[in-house]
Amino acid sequence: MMIFTGCGMQSRIDDNKSNDAYSVVDDYGNVLQFDAKPKRIYAGTLSIEELLVDLVSADRFVAISEDALDGNISLIKEQATHVKKVVPGYIGVEAILALKPDLVIVQETRNKEFIDALKDTGLKVMVTRVPTNLNMVQNRIDIIAKAVGEEERGNQIVKDMNKKLAVVQSKVGKIPEEKRKIAIAYSLMGAFGSQNGLFHDICVRSGLRNGAALAGLERGEHLSKEKIVSTNPDILIFPQYSATKKGDVNKLREDVLSDESLQTVKAVKNKNYIIIADRYRYSASQHMADAILLLSKQAYPELYVND
């Protein structure tokens, strides 16, 4: 049997028959009882699929989403091809029931009525919160690893993340707060990055100061041009591709850099910008560590010249 890893696939022995019964409590206090490791798993969102491919073998997926096969937004395109059945990114209760899963993992972003309807079918449903920081991401890895009976593998994934984070800390840890570069990130909807969002934690852990948070941006809002000017970022971060809204990301970048009202901004004057794929900017899986390392390397390339 084969199990996915971040760099490919690796052989391992999977002895489900010897597994004892166990139970797991999800983020909402629901107790899930297992007689054996689940073998027909359905994940309701891409970030959970990204985790699962490093936890279980392809034949333990009952299906995988079309999103997982889209290299613009997915970090697991190659691994996802090993799952036989492909379904749309969001499917209804009846379609999930027809898959006959023995474990359904959904995120709280699906509405309560949908989740309740899933539970009413008798399916085993695990509900997870949307991670907004590294601790929440790693806690979710722990709980999902336990649910699929792969706690040891989950522990290793977290250890691997921490090794990457330690590399970043060794490079940027000694930079005084006031000397850290200020960055402002753009989506097609505008400058974003509230202090309560996942990107803020990615930004800060990479050694940057999040300009949107410094300007007091609230969750769900976008930063005004006046705030961008007063924050005066050293770096602008643009998307390589937008997973959230249709539009021309190249035109977005050109419009911002040529905007007359932004010409006093350091990042605009110096044409100092970074382009990062959405699959990293919003990474809520083990790949959050990769996103932090990638952003840090692009923001402070001089610190990584010998790596």
Question: What positions do the PLM features span?
Answer:
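A short, structured surface patch at a secondary-structure boundary
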Residues: 43-99, 103-108, 208-211
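Short helix-initiation/N-cap motifs at beta->coil->alpha
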Residues: 27-29, 83-94, 131, 216-225
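Extracytoplasmic ligand-binding site segments that recognize negatively charged/polar headgroups
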Residues: 113-114, 129-143, 177-201
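Bacterial Sec-exported substrate-binding components of ABC uptake systems
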Residues: 4-50, 152-183, 298-307
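Structured C-terminal subdomain patch of bacterial secreted/periplasmic proteins
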Residues: 141-148, 152-155, 159, 240-307
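Short helices/loops that flank or line small-molecule/ion binding pockets
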Residues: 91-101, 120, 223-232
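Alpha-helical, coiled-coil/dimerization segments enriched in small aliphatic residues
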Residues: 70, 192-220
